[in-house]
């Protein structure tokens, strides 16, 4: 997240703070930011995720790769009472050991920052995209840096996409 700390979220504080997490944070003296405000990634990390990780303590696990998340006793076809079932999370640890964990809540913070979509609408790279790789940026640039600003100053720039990141790049 530190890589995109300069990016304003497209969701408000009211949408990115989970009520259960807020209850967990209440005894720590944490106060909910303005629900209507749109935080930057860095604000969200510093003001919410880090305090939440502290409140969760040793329940936060690191050094493992999540292979998949589902609901206990349910598959993609059986959806009756799906929301009432605990999550089952399959992880692989750095030493190769696999583990199955059960949870009432899962925070998915994986995002798409490291796996951006290619430019062609089919999900494949556009013709010529690989050849132009040195002139393509797949992330919202941090324009506070002089070198980054110089890269774009006085040039025509195409912003490809219809998602929030494309809009944020223009904002």
Regions found by a protein language model. Give the residues of each.
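Internal hydrophobic scaffold segments of catalytic domains
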Residues: 2-11, 101-103, 108, 171
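Glycine-rich active-site loop/strand segments that organize a redox cofactor
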Residues: 3-47, 139, 143-146
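Short, surface-exposed linear patches
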Residues: 10-14, 23-24, 82-84, 90, ...
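Alpha-helix boundary/capping detector
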Residues: 27-28, 75-78, 129-134
């Amino acid at each position: 997240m530190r890589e995109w700390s300069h990016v304003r979220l497209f969701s408000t504080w009211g949408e990115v703070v989970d009520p259960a997490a807020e209850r967990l944070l209440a005894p720590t003296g944490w106060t909910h930011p303005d629900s209507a405000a749109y935080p930057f990634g860095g604000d969200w990390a510093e003001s919410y995720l880090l305090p939440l990780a502290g409140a969760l303590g040793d329940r936060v696990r690191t050094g493992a790769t999540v292979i998949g998340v589902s609901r206990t006793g349910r598959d993609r076809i059986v959806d009756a009472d799906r929301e009432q079932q605990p999550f089952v999370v399959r992880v692989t640890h750095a030493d190769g050991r696999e583990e199955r964990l059960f949870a009432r809540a899962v925070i998915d913070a994986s995002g798409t920052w490291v796996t951006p979509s290619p430019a062609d609408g089919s999900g494949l790279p556009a013709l010529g995209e690989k050849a132009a790789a040195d002139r393509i940026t797949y992330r919202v640039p941090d324009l506070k840096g002089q070198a980054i600003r110089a890269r774009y100053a006085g040039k025509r720039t195409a912003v490809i996409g219809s998602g929030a990141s494309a809009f944020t790049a223009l904002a």
